[in-house]
Regions:
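Contiguous segments within soluble domain cores/interaction surfaces
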Residues: 1-124, 128-146
Length: 146
């Protein structure tokens, strides 16, 4: 498991906990393969080189506003410079509905010093959705019912 070599904000009391990082990536439900994962009722899910959460609050609290549309995207290979692009596709709709989202660095940080993108993943309607995050070489695919 690669340990990220990113700098925390100047003066930050945080430090990356390498053991917690490794454990997090090895134990989060999902797959290390680059394929779509059904989120189901799980809160944090891994697909490829991304872990995304909190799906539970996102789904239960959704009302179409940015305030209730926050998801954290944790890349396996953060570098501190790469933007995050998320393609959200409403599955089973005609015509197909696609929302393209773009989020730049800087990251936010967990208490364990793990970098993540904070986003307002605003989706316009309920239904079955596929999220495909891409940041540099990191990719993932998550399907869930909103």
């Amino acid at each position: 498991m690669p340990i990220p070599q990113v700098s925390l904000p100047n003066g930050s009391p945080l430090a990356l906990d390498a053991a917690a990082w490794t454990r997090f990536w090895r134990t989060t439900p999902g797959t290390a393969r680059n394929r779509c994962v059904d989120v189901g009722n799980r809160d944090a899910v891994r697909s490829g080189e991304f872990i995304v959460s909190p799906f539970t609050a996102f789904i239960q609290g959704w009302d179409g506003t940015e305030e209730t549309s926050k998801l954290a995207y944790i890349p396996l290979h953060p570098d501190g410079r790469t933007s995050l692009d998320v393609t959200a596709t409403r599955l089973g709709s005609e015509p197909q509905l696609t929302v393209n989202l773009h989020f730049g660095p800087p990251y936010s940080w967990t208490e364990d010093g793990m970098p993540f993108y904070v986003t307002g993943t605003v989706l316009p309607e309920r239904g079955l959705w596929r999220l495909e995050p891409v940041a540099g070489r990191d990719r993932g695919c998550f399907e869930f019912r909103l």
